[in-house]
Amino acid sequence: MPYWKELLKGDPLPWLLEPDTVQPAIRYFTLRDILGHDNSNSEVKKAQAAIMSSGPVPVMLAAQQPEGYWNKPGPGYGPKYQGTIWSVIFLAQLGADGANPQVHTSCEYVLSHSIANNGGFSANGTPSAVIHCMAGNLGSALIDLGWSGDKRLQAALEWQARTITGEGIADSQNKDSVERYYKSGTTGPLFACSANAGLSCAWGAVKAMLALGKIPLSKRSPRIQSAIQQGTDFLLSRDPAVADYPFGPGSRINSSWFKFGYPIGYVTDVLQNLEVLVALRQAQHTRLTHKVNQCFKAGFEQAKL
């Protein structure tokens, strides 16, 4: 029996593997991420086919325009949770098949319309709207949907890494430089963000690490490795179970860390923080074992978390 099963009150796998026409992705991710089957496995193929024919994914694709966008043409951030950027992010989180023609068209659309002239993913196509939470979400989604070899995506991820480390990026006062921070969006290194009063934003850090952490070790540039290390150190600088990261003026903790839902947008919860840090090989860190144990204690009679 795997070690993690011994910590639960029961075996959740039969429940997780149940066919579910409302949320078919649960079975798919269980087969792939918990049981370790790759995409060539016949059951994994069937599970992903179910995603494409039932649940939310076909509903989303039915609303897509032939050109590849949702709602209106352009960069695609708005309307929030319904625009093109959000649709691509959620398609990936829901396990959509990147080889599907409509999904492929949507990815090409955002890569053609949502990148600023500095190379970063932008909410409105301008450098001042490059922001870590959106850029990380979108980068992660595009990797999941099979675009890791695309030069535009690679450049966007390199730019995100640079904005984390600050390498060669001028401050917001240097308006003659294309490669600079802005008073809006990403305002400085180490995830500084205007939406968080210019402080380092842990939500942005989690999303950035979600994307950069999916780059294979052999493909990571020294800059990306440095950004991942800085992001990991920042997320572990506080107890992830408490989530007392910098949050605007004052010292209160953002309650959204403890409100769970899926798919997940620009907000981050403690479970996604845990997911990212485990993926970055920090599972044995003392601050993570606290949170892991807390999650296991949350299991109830049927071993459902």
Regions of interest found by a model, annotated:
Residues 1-305:
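Preference for long, amphipathic alpha-helical scaffolds in soluble/luminal domains
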